[in-house]
Amino acid sequence: MSEVKMFSEPVPNVPWQDRPANDNHDAPIWRYTENPIIGRNPAKGVARIFNSAVVPFEGKFVGVFRGEQVNGIPYIYLGESEDAIHWNISEEKIKFVDENGEEFMPIYAYDPRLVKVEDTYYAIWCQDFYGAAIGIAKSKDLKTFVRIENPFLPFNRNAVLFPRKISGNFVMLSRPSDSGHTPFGDIFVSESPDMVYWGKHRHVMGKSSEWWESLKIGGGAAPIETSEGWLLFYHGVSGTCNGYVYSIGGAILDIDNPSIVKYRCENFLLTPEEWYEERGFVPNVCFPCATIHDSESGKIAIYYGAADSYVGLAFTKLDEIVDYIKSHSVVTTSDTEIGRR
């Protein structure tokens, strides 16, 4: 097994559980045995939490959580944790303000990501802007969130910011789509000098001939910088006679030009099979949104939404997952910037 390095701050208190001796899954990812870590009715007025993002913060952990309110409208709530497993969810929605400090609340907000770039945290979510569109807010303290310009025109979802600038620019993945439930979708990458004006749009990768991701794909957790490239966990969707099935996939993008796919795993890494993934408000969903990872040990904790009803936690080791992706890689001519390599 090759030695792979991770370039990020160490997180010695990363949540962790060793792989069970009786785990026979092909991919080196295993579920936390006490899943789901967040169940139904986790806070007053919130029926379900799922598809949420978490980060280390001042020795503890903070997250932005998609909460389905009891009126059915999704919004984003803050949560705090000592161990990144047991979460205290605020009963109050995040209060967004504009750059003048005036309240500026989206009509609804869902599927957030949370990424630190330099000394600023960026929350990214899907909202209504004449249809499904990307919203962004910045924060220094994870208490006050200042909204900034929407990066793209509608319709777009699944925006994921890279954790550092590349060649002096912010870099973000997104998935252009329609305003409905989107029976299509490829991952694109865009650049910005200031988080306001976005351009240099490039195609990264699309759906594949593998059945588990034959309908559409979308970005998941923020990419992890490694010596092999950017490690990306994403979701792939298949269509069945019983509806969509969302699984977790893995790819490695070029470190300097992330529109280039170096490796893309032909197999899913995690697919619905536990009760909390197969049964829920939207059945058969594993939807990755965040990782907590420790550069010293190579431990990676993956947070994913389960059946649009719960939050699940899974684990892997950097060396093992990179080796698995590389040894099961199929990169097609439809992947990368302009459809050829």
What residue spans do the PLM features occupy?
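Beta-rich carbohydrate-recognition and catalytic domains
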Residues: M1-I107, V115-L215, I224-N284, S295-K299, ...
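Catalytic core of Fe(II)/2-oxoglutarate
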Residues: A221
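C-terminal substrate/ligand-recognition segments
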Residues: C289, H293
